[in-house]
């Protein structure tokens, strides 16, 4: 099994959720994140004063998938999250040793 983690632009969340649902994903975790990549933040002007915003708001999406499905789901996320601008995000895949559904005790693929 794999844990797919994506950091995306907040305005792309609905597109990513819709695309993953169409790909057969029945569950995911979404959380707010702040960070920066190559863009290293930006500068804003408020009431005449200039401020450096070095942590940019992002959304973290996590999906657990079978090994065979991981590549397709990564492509699905990348396609849905792409706006063609700097800061679109990153997707990474990590090995997952086990998954257990708390309610039933099911493990492995049955718990996804």
Where are the regions that the model predicts?
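Positively charged, small/polar-rich N-terminal and surface patches that mediate targeting and assembly
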Residues: 1-112
């Amino acid at each position: 099994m794999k844990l797919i983690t994506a950091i995306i632009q907040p305005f792309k969340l609905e597109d990513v959720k819709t695309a993953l649902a169409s790909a057969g994903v029945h569950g995911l975790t979404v959380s707010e994140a702040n960070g920066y990549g190559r863009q290293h933040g930006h500068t804003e002007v408020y009431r005449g004063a200039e401020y450096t915003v070095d942590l940019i708001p992002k959304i973290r999406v996590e999906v657990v998938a079978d090994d065979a499905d991981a590549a397709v789901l990564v492509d699905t996320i990348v396609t849905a999250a792409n706006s063609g601008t700097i800061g679109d995000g990153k997707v990474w895949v990590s090995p997952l040793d086990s998954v257990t559904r708390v309610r039933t005790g099911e493990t492995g693929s049955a718990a996804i």
